[in-house]
């Protein structure tokens, strides 16, 4: 332990700054075979914190680009020796091709695998993960090809006094869920990480474009009062 701490003080790892559109690849590995379930487009707050503010499935990019992104993810998963279970691989599409940001041997957060994947493909990755852990064969066959999206809600910083329009947003056909991570009376700081996000809207459409449009309609209905 002493040696490890000394090494930390004497060196650092420097990563190349990557510019380009951001994606995540949702995969499930079974007996060494990596199955790509979905490719997700990511929307962030931009510099300096790049907080994830939305996800959309399927990706809007052409099939050949999605294939390249998927192959890079699969190569990274293979290199790490992940043979069983889920992986969530974040990728940037740079001017020199897809580059891996990170690989997590886990299901994707931000409602990606709990909500968006089943809404866009019909594949229940949570159930599949449990079945793999039990030594059973998971069902990874896509049932349909629809659009799904989530957009996070973020008012200006201040004290969260009230919110209106939630019932109207929930009443829009195609809106699956409107939820909140913060309670009335909480202090909402300036957005710097995912824990600062206040709420979210999840939608499903026959296409990704429809899902995005429905998200936009629902978000416009929701009005925050901050003091």
Regions found by a protein language model. Give the residues of each.
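Single conserved hydrophobic/aromatic residue that forms the stacking wall/gate
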Residues: 1-13
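Short, flexible turn/loop "capping" segments at secondary-structure junctions
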Residues: 5, 49-50, 109, 191-196
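A short catalytic or substrate-binding loop motif that flags glycine-/basic-rich loops and adjacent residues
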Residues: 17-20, 81-83, 193
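Bateman (tandem CBS) regulatory domains
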Residues: 51-59
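A short, glycine/Asx- and small/polar-enriched loop/turn
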Residues: 93-99, 192-196
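Peripheral (often C-terminal) accessory segments that flank ATP-dependent C-N-forming ligase machineries
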Residues: 128-227
């Amino acid at each position: 332990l002493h040696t490890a701490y000394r090494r930390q003080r004497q060196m650092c790892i420097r990563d190349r700054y990557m510019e380009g559109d951001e994606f995540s690849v949702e995969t499930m590995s079974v007996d060494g075979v990596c199955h790509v379930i979905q490719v997700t487009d990511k929307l962030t707050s931009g510099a300096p914190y790049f907080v994830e503010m939305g996800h959309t499935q399927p990706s809007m990019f052409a099939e050949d680009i999605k294939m390249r992104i998927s192959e890079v993810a699969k190569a990274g998963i293979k290199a790490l020796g992940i043979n069983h279970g889920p992986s969530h691989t974040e990728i940037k599409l740079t001017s020199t091709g897809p580059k891996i940001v990170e690989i997590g041997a886990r299901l994707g957060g931000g409602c990606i695998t709990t909500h968006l994947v089943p809404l866009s493909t019909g594949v229940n990755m949570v159930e599949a993960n449990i079945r793999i852990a039990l030594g059973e064969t998971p069902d990874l066959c896509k049932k349909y090809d629809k659009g799904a999206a989530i957009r996070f809600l973020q008012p200006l910083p201040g004290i969260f006094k009230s919110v209106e329009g939630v019932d109207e947003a929930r009443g829009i056909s195609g809106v699956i869920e409107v939820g909140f991570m913060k309670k009335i009376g909480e202090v909402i700081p300036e957005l710097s990480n995912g824990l600062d996000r206040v709420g979210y809207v999840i939608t499903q459409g026959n296409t990704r474009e429809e899902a995005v449009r429905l998200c936009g309609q629902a978000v416009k209905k929701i009005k925050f009062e901050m003091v």
